Curated annotation (Swiss-Prot):
PTM comment text: Phosphorylated by CheA. Phosphorylation of the N-terminal regulatory domain activates the methylesterase activity.
CheB-type methylesterase domain sequence ranges: 204-393
Protein name according to UniProt: Protein-glutamate methylesterase/protein-glutamine glutaminase
Keywords noted in UniProt: Chemotaxis, Cytoplasm, Hydrolase, Phosphoprotein
Lineage, highest ranks first: Bacteria, Pseudomonadati, Spirochaetota, Spirochaetia, Spirochaetales
Length: 403
């Protein structure tokens, strides 16, 4: 029997087999249920008011109304139900997926293929994690709207005390210790642990130096978050930017191209030997690690296929480690929304070296996992909301360029 607290999922795909496969994934996950199934976007639009889903899983290629057309109608009708794209790994699928993100889709997962393959198990876990993350956030948003309309307190169902910490391995063991600071004080506050929480206090080895590079790590929720930030970065930002976004192979080139359309800086997928220079943003290629090397005359990017770190390739920790090694106290490390702990350990190293560090705050994260672990380690100098992140980067870049 369906629980009213379940996250209701609408599956939109023209393949009966795919609807069945994904339906089994949803039905097999605790806390999730199927709101309905539709064979194209037109049927999905007709069903929305009746089934009231919390998340929509949307195929791209469908007759009568495809994924792009559905998103265009969703935008026109001002429907804010989160949409997760079910994408193929083909080049054309990657291009259309990025167009979907531009139209307001929240995120994407690659379509399952095969029946008992490791890929199917991996994708199934990702579908469940993404649906849970976006669905819980939307349910809270909808509940908050109802309570505000009735002028009553917002109540969360039992077990949803912290809707942002959805990392399946760590959600029970990582109480939040990052104290929120007033806006006027955010640049200088100290992080204090909550009652009973453990936290390592890091004492930097040296004072922060002149800022020479900005490194960003992000996972779940990252595509739309980075688009939001990059659209607001100043064209005269003095430092180069390097980014790890957890993303499969075949998508990052189109992702970088999409970001380049909205950013005043040059955004490109990193290639071996690329110059890391002012006016440029380098995105780690899917399924490859990105590192930087500071030489006497220039800083260059390196790409490798070493083993995954923290279960990820590209890994934020791998990038941050190289930044800490070559730039010591002259970097800005930023850890944003995402499951797990990738990036937290090496953000702590950056902080220890004297570099400046920022974590996205809990309220604006789709999943408050990676930033939360960094806070537990005492590695965060400032918490910043997504809406304030671009302005903060612009401010850091200019104020600390010659400190």
């Amino acid at each position: 029997m369906k629980n009213t607290n379940d996250i209701a999922v609408l599956i939109v795909d023209d393949s009966a087999l795919m609807r069945k496969v994904i339906g089994k994934v949803i039905e097999g996950a605790p806390g999730l249920s199927i709101a309905g199934k539709a064979m194209n976007g037109r049927f999905a639009l007709d069903m929305l008011e009746r089934v009231q889903p919390d998340v929509i899983l949307l195929d791209l290629e469908m007759p009568h109304m495809n994924g792009l057309q559905f998103l265009e109608q969703r935008k026109r009708l001002r429907i804010d139900i989160p949409v997760i794209i079910l994408s193929s790994i083909a080049k054309e699928g990657a291009r259309v997926t990025m167009q979907c993100l531009e139209l307001g889709a929240s995120d994407f997962v690659t379509k399952p293929f095969g029946s008992e393959s490791a890929h199917l198990r991996t994708v199934s876990r990702k579908i469940v994690d993404y649906v849970t993350a976006y669905g819980r956030r939307y349910k809270l948003l909808r509940r908050t709207r109802r309570c505000l309309a009735m002028d009553t307190p917002v109540e969360r169902p039992a077990g949803e005390e912290d809707l942002n910490c959805l990392d399946t391995q760590e959600r029970a063991s990582l109480p939040s210790v990052c104290a929120r600071a007033p806006a006027r004080d955010r640049a200088s506050y100290t992080i204090t642990p909550t009652e009973g929480a453990r936290q390592t206090r890091i004492v930097p080895l040296r004072e922060s130096g002149a800022l020479q590079i900005i490194a960003i790590g992000v996972s779940t929720g990252g595509p739309s978050a980075l688009r939001h930030i990059f659209a607001q970065l100043d064209a005269d930002l003095p430092q180069p930017v390097v980014v790890v976004q957890h993303m499969p192979a075949g998508f990052t080139r189109e992702f970088a191209y999409s970001l380049n359309q909205v950013c005043a800086l040059e955004v490109k997928e990193a290639q071996e030997g690329d110059l890391v220079r002012r006016g440029r943003v380098l995105i780690a290629p899917g399924d490859r690690h990105l590192t930087v090397e500071r030489r006497s005359l220039a800083t260059v990017a390196h790409i490798n296929s070493d083993e995954p770190e923290n279960g990820h390739r590209p890994s934020v920790d791998v990038l941050f480690e190289s930044v800490a090694r070559h730039f010591e106290n002259r970097a800005l490390g930023i850890l944003m929304t995402g499951m797990g702990r990738d990036g937290a350990a090496q953000l702590a190293r950056l902080y220890t070296e004297g570099s400046r560090t920022i974590a996205q705050d809990a309220d604006s994260c789709i999943v408050y996992g990676m930033p939360r672990v960094a806070c537990e380690l005492g590695a965060v100098g400032e918490q910043v909301s997504l809406d304030d992140m671009a302005a903060t980067i612009n401010r850091y870049g200019k104020v600390f360029a010659s400190s």
